[in-house]
Amino acid sequence: MFRQLIAVLVVALCVGAGTMTAQSQSQTAADTFIWHGELVSVDQATGTFTVKARMLADAAKEVARFKASDKVVLTWSGVDRYGDAIRQIAKHDPTQKMTDPFAFPVELASPDVQNEYVTFKFRAPNAVGSVKSVKPGEWVTVTTKKGSANDVQAVVSVEPYNKPASNT
């Protein structure tokens, strides 16, 4: 009887642990969104990425209000987990809670918008190694926490847009 009870408890724990893991992974996916940009540069020492991304025409007009190195909040147009183009740019106020899930703070690298692309910087020290094969001018896929107010933690990952095929 005691062995049966132990066996039932072990099975219950295994099933429960598997369910918890699946919930954690899906919750993480639901709390992030992905967007694509052109890699300009990576400062390996600081983990700072400089990227160009597309802006909607109305948002592009607003960039002239800012100067290089200003902290701004970019808000992406998007649905579910996918950001398309930047739809809004605003001054970053670290005391204000971000309510839009597709917004995160960055540093404006240049107030010049060329062909509806804006250049900005963000920190993602843990992602530097994953883009060693990416050259400036190539595209990256960036996963960002929804509504993150902390620029160090906003970006979850940066990966090559075209991942090399694995040999498995």
Language-model regions, residue ranges each:
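Short, flexible, surface-exposed loop segments at domain boundaries
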Residues: 2-7, 12-168
